[in-house]
C-alpha cells in the first residue's frame, strides 16, 4: 500500500512511500544514494505524495502535480495518457522518471553530471540532493540545504538498497596523541600513515565499524581490515574502507575474524620494525586489500585517505592532533536495516524535518 491523495502526508506516511520508491528504483539499477537524494527533494516538493496538487489546488493543470511537482501538470498528465497509464498513480510517476532518464528529459546538466550518471552515483545523499535540486527541480530559490538533510535522513532510515544500517566510522582510540604524522621520516615519507601513542603501553583501540580481518602479516606485526559495509566518513562521504593496524605482538586475530563496531581490535605495541610502543595506522578507499606499496615500506597499496577525513573523533580526547582537521559528526548509526529501532529518538527530528519541508508552505517555482 502507498499513500496517494491531495493532502500533505505525515512522516509515517512519507516513510511508507519512500520505502516503496527505494525498492522500485533499486530494482531498476539506481543507487540508494541517488534515490535518497531525490527523496530529499520529493519531501520538499510533495511530501513524497504522488497525488498532491500544488497548493492543494486540485485539477489546476497549470500548476505543479505529483512526486516532483511537474509544472505545468499537463505535461506529465498528457504523457501518462499517451502511455495508457493512470496519472494519479505511484508506478506511473516512477515510470515517467525512468523515461526521463532514458530520454534525457527534464534534466539540465548544471552540476557536471548527467541524469544517467546521477542514478549510478555513490556520492553522498546530501551531495546528490543538491545536484538533483539544481539540475532537475531548478526552483527560484536554489538555497535549500534542508533537502540535503532530508536526503541523509532517508538514507539512514530506509532499509535495503545497499545502505541500511549505515555506521559512522569512529576513530578507534579514545585519545589522539600523534608521535609521527603524514609524510614523516623513515617509513612515513610520502605516505598518509600516522603513528599514535597511548596513555600507557599496550593501550587499547577498538573497531571503528563492523569489519573483517583480511590479512595477517606476522613478520611486520600487522593486521589489515575492511569494513563490512559502506560507512559514513567524518567528511560526509560514504564508502568502503580498508585499513591496517601495525605493531601489536603477538597478533590477536586470524584472517576471517569479524568484529562489531566498538569491539576491542588491538593495542599499541613494539612488534615488527619499531622504535617505542605505538600504533601505526593507515587507511585506503575501497574494500580490497592490495598489499603493501614501497613508500618506502609501510603504506597500503591503493588510494590512501587522510585518517582525519575518514574517522570521526566524537568523544575523543585530542592531546596532540598535529594541527590536522579532525572532525566530529552528528551522524547516528543506522538501525541495521529494519528502519525501526531509532523511531522514538527521531520523533522530534521527524517533526522538525517535516516543518522544514517547502510543501507545507507552498512551492517555489
Curated annotation (Swiss-Prot):
Keywords: Antimicrobial, Bacteriolytic enzyme, Cell wall biogenesis/degradation, Degradation of host cell envelope components during virus entry, Degradation of host peptidoglycans during virus entry, Glycosidase, Hydrolase, Late protein, Metal-binding, Metalloprotease, Multifunctional enzyme, Protease, Viral genome ejection through host cell envelope, Viral penetration into host cytoplasm, Viral release from host cell, Viral short tail ejection system, Viral tail assembly, Virion, Virus entry into host cell, Zinc. Residues 160-165 are annotated as: Linker. GO terms for molecular function: hydrolase activity, acting on glycosyl bonds; metal ion binding; metallopeptidase activity. It comes from the Viruses. Residues 1-159 are annotated as: Lysozyme-like glycosidase. The keyword Cell wall biogenesis/degradation applies. Residues 166-365 are annotated as: Probable metalloendopeptidase. SUPFAM superfamilies: Duplicated hybrid motif. This is Morphogenesis protein 1. It comes from Bacillus phage phi29 (Bacteriophage phi-29). The lineage of its organism: Viruses, Duplodnaviria, Heunggongvirae, Uroviricota, Caudoviricetes.
Amino acid at each position: 500500500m502507498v499513500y496517494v491523495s491531495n493532502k500533505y502526508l505525515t512522516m509515517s506516511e512519507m516513510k511508507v512511500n519512500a520505502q516503496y520508491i527505494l525498492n522500485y528504483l533499486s530494482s531498476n539499477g539506481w543507487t540508494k544514494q541517488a534515490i535518497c537524494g531525490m527523496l530529499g527533494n520529493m519531501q520538499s516538493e510533495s511530501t513524497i505524495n504522488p497525488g498532491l496538487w500544488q497548493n492543494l489546488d486540485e485539477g489546476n493543470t497549470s500548476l505543479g502535480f505529483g512526486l516532483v511537482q511537474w509544472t505545468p501538470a499537463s505535461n506529465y498528465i498528457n504523457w501518462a495518457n499517451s502511455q495508457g497509464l493512470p496519472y494519479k498513480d505511484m508506478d506511473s510517476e516512477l515510470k515517467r522518471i525512468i523515461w526521463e532518464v532514458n530520454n534525457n528529459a527534464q534534466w539540465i546538466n548544471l552540476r557536471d553530471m548527467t541524469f544517467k550518471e546521477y542514478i549510478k552515483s555513490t556520492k553522498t545523499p546530501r551531495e546528490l540532493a543538491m545536484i538533483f535540486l539544481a539540475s532537475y527541480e531548478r526552483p527560484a530559490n536554489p538555497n535549500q540545504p534542508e533537502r540535503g538533510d532530508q536526503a541523509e535522513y532517508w538514507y539512514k532510515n530506509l532499509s535495503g538498497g545497499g545502505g541500511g544500517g549505515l555506521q559512522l566510522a569512529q576513530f578507534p582510540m579514545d585519545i589522539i596523541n600523534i608521535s609521527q604524522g603524514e609524510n614523516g621520516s623513515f617509513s612515513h615519507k610520502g605516505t598518509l600513515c600516522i603513528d599514535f601513542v597511548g596513555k600507557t603501553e599496550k593501550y587499547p583501540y577498538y573497531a571503528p565499524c563492523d569489519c573483517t580481518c583480511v590479512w595477517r602479516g606476522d613478520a611486520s606485526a600487522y593486521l589489515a581490515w575492511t569494513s563490512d559495509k559502506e560507512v559514513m566518513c567524518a567528511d560526509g562521504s560514504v564508502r568502503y574502507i580498508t585499513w591496517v593496524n601495525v605493531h601489536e605482538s603477538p597478533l590477536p586475530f586470524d584472517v576471517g575474524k569479524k568484529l562489531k563496531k566498538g569491539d576491542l581490535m588491538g593495542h599499541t605495541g613494539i612488534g615488527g620494525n619499531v622504535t617505542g610502543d605505538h600504533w601505526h595506522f593507515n587507511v585506503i578507499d575501497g574494500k580490497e586489500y592490495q598489499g603493501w606499496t614501497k613508500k618506502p615500506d609501510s603504506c597500503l597499496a591503493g588510494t590512501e585517505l587522510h585518517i582525519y577525513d575518514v574517522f570521526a573523533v566524537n568523544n575523543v580526547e585530542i592531546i596532540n592532533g598535529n594541527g590536522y582537521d579532525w572532525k566530529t559528526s552528528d551522524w547516528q548509526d543506522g538501525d541495521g536495516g529494519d528502519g525501526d529501532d531509532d523511531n522514538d529518538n527521531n520523533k522530534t527530528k521527524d517533526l522538525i524535518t517535516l516543518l522544514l519541508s517547502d510543501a507545507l508552505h507552498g512551492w517555489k517555482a
